[in-house]
């Protein structure tokens, strides 16, 4: 997911942080990722786009708090908030390619991470603890219909415009990126 490195490198650059601070932030993100991997999923084919961009945003939010000198509790709160905002996002790639609306959803996840980090740093209470949000993320992913989990069978994937794009892409094999 591009949300994690995009948000972290952009924030580190903006704050003019040394590389060591970025590495520490990546470790914080990784710890959140361990919790997600252990109790939910990162695969859009299993949990929709919230499993990919949502997880990336949740990990990035915690890392940004670390970069800005926040507390452990604030990092966890930021991750919880970001994941709460991502629940239920489906995976419906246009033209059966992981390009659109994927890029926009990665941008959304990165901006969500920055916003949630700032909320947590302002001591906004996340209300639902991170572990319960991750459990909910798993449950919601299980409830998302299979047509909305990177199958090219639902959502934007089946619009008339998307089908025209898919047909055009199939006319020139090998020219475009691989499909899901």
Question: What role is predicted for each listed range?
Answer:
Residues 57, 62-180:
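Functionally critical mobile loop/hinge segments
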Residues 1-88:
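Phosphate/pyrophosphate-binding betaalpha-module
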């Amino acid at each position: 997911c591009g949300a994690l490195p995009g948000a972290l490198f952009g924030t580190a650059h903006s704050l003019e942080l040394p590389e060591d601070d970025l590495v520490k932030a990546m470790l914080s993100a990784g710890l959140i990722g361990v919790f997600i991997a252990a109790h939910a999923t990162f695969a859009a084919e299993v949990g929709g786009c919230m499993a990919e961009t949502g997880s990336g945003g949740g990990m990035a939010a915690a890392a940004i708090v670390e970069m800005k000198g926040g507390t452990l509790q604030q990092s966890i709160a930021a991750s919880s908030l970001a994941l709460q905002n991502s629940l239920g996002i489906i995976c419906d790639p246009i033209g059966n390619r992981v390009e659109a609306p994927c890029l926009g959803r990665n941008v959304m996840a990165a901006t969500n991470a920055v916003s949630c980090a700032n909320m947590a740093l302002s001591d906004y209470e996340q209300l639902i603890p991170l572990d319960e949000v991750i459990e909910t993320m798993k449950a919601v992913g299980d409830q998302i219909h299979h047509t909305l989990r990177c199958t090219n069978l639902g959502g934007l994937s089946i619009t008339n415009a998307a089908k025209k794009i898919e047909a055009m892409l199939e006319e020139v094999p090998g020219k475009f990126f691989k499909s899901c």
